[in-house]
């Protein structure tokens, strides 16, 4: 299994157990980012509805049981709110930081990053109100944010990651 970690904080933010797709359904963004679909799961109770053979075990849940988004729970992501102006300042600094990282560690990615990053960020800014932002476990604003949004009528969010801000670790 591969776990994806932030290059600046080593926060675990995703794994290869999730199918990676084109961000926002736009194939051109795939060179710089990827998107995964989340699921809800029940956390807390040991029974999980097995005793009553219920497909929707939520009905009989006790007070100590809650529904969680699997990616948020598994990787200890924390929702954070940013104004559009705050995000603009953050992303400008983050993109400069990623560019410097790529120049030092992955010079072959610099041109791709320079070409593809701007349209991706423009898409995020254009649809800013559709996003929820998540931070990794360290809660360090130097790290990359994870972008969450709902696609169509789906009941769980999709999460988008900037690939060049992550590295893979095999387990």
From Swiss-Prot:
Highest taxon listed in the record's lineage: Eukaryota
Keywords recorded for this protein, A-Z: Calcium, Cytoplasm
Coiled coil regions, renumbered to chain: none
InterPro entries in alphabetical order: Mss4-like_sf (IPR011057), Mss4/transl-control_tumour (IPR011323), TCTP (IPR034737), Translational_control_tumour_p (IPR018105)
Annotated GO MF terms: calcium ion binding
Pfam families: TCTP (PF00838)
Annotated GO CC locations: cytoplasm
SUPFAM superfamilies in the record: Mss4-like (SSF51316)
Domain TCTP: 1-171
Main location per the UniProt record: cytoplasm
Record keyword Calcium present: yes
Compartments where located: Cytoplasm
Gene3D superfamilies: Metal Binding Protein, Guanine Nucleotide Exchange Factor, Chain A
Function: Involved in calcium binding and microtubule stabilization.
Similarity annotation: Belongs to the TCTP family.
Protein name (record): Translationally-controlled tumor protein homolog
Record organism: Plasmodium knowlesi
Gene: TCTP
